[in-house]
Amino acid sequence: MKVDFDSLNNIFFVGIKGSGVCSLACFLNSKGYFVEGVDVSDKFHTDKILSNNKISYYENIYEFSLKELGRSFDLIVYSSAYDKYGLPALLEAKELNIPILSYSEVLGELSRKYYSVGIAGSHGKTTTTAFLGLLFNKLGLNPNVIVGSSVKDFGDNSAIAGISNIFIAETCEYKKHFLHFSPNMLILTNIDYEHVDFFENYEALEDAFLQYINNLKKNGILIINSDDNNLLKIKRQINRKDINIFSFGSKDLSNFQISNIVVKNEYFCFSFLGLCNVELRTVLFHNVLNFSAALLALNLFLESNGKSIFDFEEAVKKIAKNYSGIKRRVEVVKEKKGVIYMDDYAHHPREIRDTLLGIKDFYKNKRIILDFMPHTFTRTKEFFNDFVEVLSVADILILHNIYLSNRENFNPDELSVKLFLNIKKINKNTYFFKDVKDSVEFIKSLLISGDLFITMGAGNNFILHDFL
């Protein structure tokens, strides 16, 4: 279904607290549309974003009635966490002949309106999207941006409604949602087997990425991370001759190589694209890759559009050095009595490994206390041995019951305890609390000055920071 955005006034979002859906709602709200929505009563970081944007929403998604609301809507946008006609509000919309589109379908419609840049990958797409939006915005290019988390440099928002024809969006591979998107430029950060409840094997996931590459508009630009072997394999399978492919990375085989990488205080310093001694405020090397991807995309955009930025090098270096971070991405929540409190969204074994090892390397003399909540039964079961291996790296580990997705109907208790017992065999400093709040007093008794405490996962254990 094609959307005529000029004819829309009122838009209603079902599942408005989802990260992407919230960003889209804020984006369209800033563009002047009347936006409302509904979701569950559980609290997420998106509650604050919606409140900051003065967007009204209801918290009774399973009982909510559009008819009782007494307002007419031109479009219903729903989260993929729900079936298209799986809720009363969606059934009512169908009965009332109100157009119903998924979040990813609306994102796809927007991509056809603009010069669009899509960012995809199993890991790092949120951060890369934020970096790209930040660069374009700070350099005066007035972009439109939709990213899956709140960005401090966006004023703690997850969207920018600019006045240019540039549209930058994080796009997701789950259920092949990104195939709705039609980019002029595509950035791929990496590929890892993930979303095992949908992709039956790695080959199915790889095929989805190849399909997405074929969505590039004529003479489109593809940017890949050549440090990722899976992306190099995909590169060899691309048949379209009109696509312009550029690679970046820390290895010699990349078209554009990152060099002179050193850690200095709170910064990773590196050289890239002729810019020497760029200082990026981050504790993780993979953010150097993410920033470099964004910087290369910016450079290619400027070249292909005949644009230039006054004092480009100094401006980019200032942006990198002053980068303030993203919600739930190695976020420093607070420092209290000599303890650093952090929060991170890592929920796949590779993300957990890279984040934990990066933190341990950066904070060499600190004791790392990890509070982890596994996310989805299917992911935990599929990567069970990998989880056991990577989680045992923490100096002290606190585990909780698996946080199920809306699509799952399993009892998580047995698998959660099994994970705990298997890790305990490797790391005796492993503890289990089924419910998050039950661990508060125990964690308080553990923490001493000099520790680093980090909550990790896609569940709700981040609430611990409110009690510590």
From Swiss-Prot:
Chief location bin: cytoplasm
UniProt keyword ATP-binding present: yes
Gene Ontology terms: cellular component: cytoplasm
Protein name as annotated: UDP-N-acetylmuramate--L-alanine ligase
Keywords: ATP-binding, Cell cycle, Cell division, Cell shape, Cell wall biogenesis/degradation, Cytoplasm, Ligase, Nucleotide-binding, Peptidoglycan synthesis
Enzyme class: ligase
Pfam family, one: Mur_ligase
Reaction catalysed by this enzyme: UDP-N-acetyl-alpha-D-muramate + L-alanine + ATP = UDP-N-acetyl-alpha-D-muramoyl-L-alanine + ADP + phosphate + H(+)
Gene name, Swiss-Prot/TrEMBL: murC
Pathway(s) where this gene product acts: Cell wall biogenesis; peptidoglycan biosynthesis
Location(s) in or outside the cell: Cytoplasm
NCBIfam families the record matches: murC
GO aspect biological process, one term: cell division
GO molecular function, one term: UDP-N-acetylmuramate-L-alanine ligase activity
Function: Cell wall formation.
